Amino acid sequence: MGGIPPGLWVALLDDARSRARVHEKVYRRGPGQCHYWLGALTSSGHGRVRLRVRAASAPHPASVVVAADVYLYQESRGLLRPLPDGAYPLVRHRCGEPSCLNPIHLAGGTAGGSAAGAIAAGSMTGQAADIRGAQGRAMAIRDAIVGAIAAGATPGEIAVAIEAAAVAGIPAVQMALPFPGGTDLLPGHCRADTGVAAAAASLVVILAGQGELF
């Protein structure tokens, strides 16, 4: 819950301006793909945003920094409820990408369950293997999307930019290139179609040959 009391969470989730501020910073793709955060990022690669709202019982508006994944998880599933020990569940990312905000990739769990779930989702070939660290990886993906949009890129071109940014921090010796066998070894659930992944992999090969991956 990030130290935010339930009453304030209710106000934040009900406030149209708060919802709009969160949603405007999410780049959405297909139903099963990662939806990436385009705003500020924590050192762990999670999205964050400052919101201002007044709770029903509060005399003055509150200004709080909110975890984007916690906000969107609760928006889609309802308020997090405390565990038997009084602690609140964590929001984990089944895809292994902390900046992903696709609600179907988010799940409630404990710290141990979060780590196990990330490994089970295949993040050891993605975020966990990235030499840039979680924040560096998330920033690279965010900046690739923002730059592609600013350049007027098509959704397909943006998908190529995302894949290239995602694999650029993974040492080539640890990465199996995804053609001709498809995209099964690309990070998490953030795989594009085979053609897009092959284009991204081709870009990685070119960069590796030029010594620009490290």
Question: Where do the model's predicted regions map?
Answer:
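Short helix-coil boundary/hinge micro-motifs
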Residues: 1-66, 86, 95-98, 159-163, ...
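Short, cationic Gly/His-enriched loop motifs
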Residues: 62-189
